[in-house]
Amino acid sequence: MNGKQLKNSILQWAIQGKLVPQDPNDEPASVLLDKIRAEKARLIKEGKIKKDKKESIIYRGEDNSYYEKFADGKVVCIDDEIPYKLPFGWTWCRLNELGIYRKGPFGSSLTKSMFVPKSKHSIKVYEQKNAIQKDYRLGEYYISKDKFSEMQSFVTHPSDIIVSCAGTIGETYFLPQDAPIGIINQALMRVRLYNLDIVDYWQLFFAYILLIEK
């Protein structure tokens, strides 16, 4: 087994809960999901986000099969989607239940002709290399405050995760508290989790998804 294979195996063991002993006294994942759903409901009520029409809940039925219940009441058996048995206290959910995902703007919405010199009034444009090299200080592209006001859908803040979506796909970077507010460019996706307690787990599982899809 080479280094890459070992790394992939460790990642898979971690995702399946086989890397370290599981503590039965740990708070079950269902409690955390309830907190996330409550936070999402609050944001919807305050008009900060829109209700997800594809929202669903995954649960295990009395027959031990897994089902997904959608917002319209439809229930579907998803046993064929379950890749492995979960440890006690773990539960399945869709990634979109954990946060808000936003791809960068189309090419014509953000071009080099719109960039301005760096100043105390300019706004940072986050690039793919920020995600790949895990450093918010990299990059030399900025936009004016007027342009920034037109691109509010692509704004990123500290505690967001940026994901590279072109070339080197799937590199993730959690923006620290001292990272400046900016916007993402075309090669990035912004992820804003409802609960920051799951940042490490989200990044781990996202890496696992990319691994199994290769």
Predicted features and spans:
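Basic, amphipathic alpha-helical recognition segments used for DNA target recognition
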Residues: L95-R102, A131-L138, Q152, P158, ...
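Extended, domain-scale alpha-helical bundle/helix-rich regions
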Residues: L6-E81
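Short beta-strand/loop turn elements enriched in aromatics
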Residues: V116-Y136
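Short alpha-helix capping/helix-loop boundary micro-motifs
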Residues: K145-M151
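Short, charged beta-turn/beta-strand-edge "cap" motif at the junction between a beta-strand
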Residues: G167-E171
